Amino acid sequence: MNRGVLESSPVQHLTAAGNPNWWNNVSRGLRPPTPLMSHEPPSTTAFIPSLLPNFFSSPTSSSSSSPSFPPPNSNPNFSSWLEMSDLPLDQPWSLSQLLLGGLMMGEEEKMEMMNHHHHQNQHQSYQAKRIQNWEEQVLRHQASMKQESSNNNSYGIMSSPNSPPNKSCATIINTNEDNNNNIHSGLNLSECNSSEMIGSSFANKKPKLQVPSSQSTLKVRKEKLGGRIASLHQLVSPFGKTDTASVLSEAIGYIRFLHSQIEALSLPYFGTPSRNNMMHQHAQRNMNGIFPEDPGQLVNEYCMKRGVSLSSTDNQKSNPNEEPMKDLRSRGLCLVPISCTLQVGSDNGADYWAPAFGTTLQ
């Protein structure tokens, strides 16, 4: 036992003060005070369990042989011990130390115990702050990972060959932490692994291939072609048909119709038989064209017939004895034959076109 503790024990204090009645009080035990006493000292069972709640599982029963302690106010060291609330009571004090001076320890031991208790409180508060900081870092990391995954959702992520695909966050965590830190490190490891699994799933996705320049030009050409087909549809306007094939077929028929009209208007100015033969051959080639069902070939057939009639009129002119044909067609008054008007009642009337505004058919 410490020497300073023995020197400050209550036995030596009472004997040094010259109190011969102390042993009589110990032998007699606790007796009720006389009516003349104004202050009643507390019993052993009254203040020992209150001072030492962590050392005795049940309250100690008072007996005649148990020593009685002096009142708390009789010794200043004892009163100062009772008033201190920050001294720890979790040390394994023995009963002899408590009775012979454990409660009256020296100032150095008191300061040492207070410093130890203060260091423990600081360590616990530091660990709690560190755990809170780790939680904030994990939350920020998760938020950043979610933002990166949402940004790279439509483009894909390519992992660099130098960095490993699955980098664990367990190396950051100190392995010498206490049990709370170990549990928290396990939570961090699971959260980091889950976030890395999300990142690896995005990394495994193949990035979108860059569109080559040829495809972009084809797209522009398709857009231009679509606009041209729309303009052709406005010109030819097939009856209830909007598909591309019908629009192109109507446009081809319309072009052939215009070509035949030009030929019909220019034939009177070419009276040579060689020219008539050329027109007849051209009309025959059109009859054997790629589109035999195309309605524009009817006009070509008419041109062929008209070429034959013109050749006959030329022959009649060459033979003045023969009587010329007396009809409107021979005089050039009817450029569009009546047979073309029969196509109005057919399914496809692309070859019949209304005259322009202010003009009439001759």
From Swiss-Prot:
One of its GO terms (molecular function) is DNA-binding transcription factor activity. Homodimer. Gene3D superfamilies: Helix-loop-helix DNA-binding domain. Belongs to the bHLH protein family. InterPro entries: bHLH95_bHLH (IPR045239), bHLH_dom (IPR011598), HLH_DNA-bd_sf (IPR036638), IND-like (IPR045843). One of its GO terms (cellular component) is nucleus. Keywords: DNA-binding, Nucleus, Transcription, Transcription regulation. This is Transcription factor bHLH133. Residues 209-258 form the bHLH domain. It is found in: Nucleus.
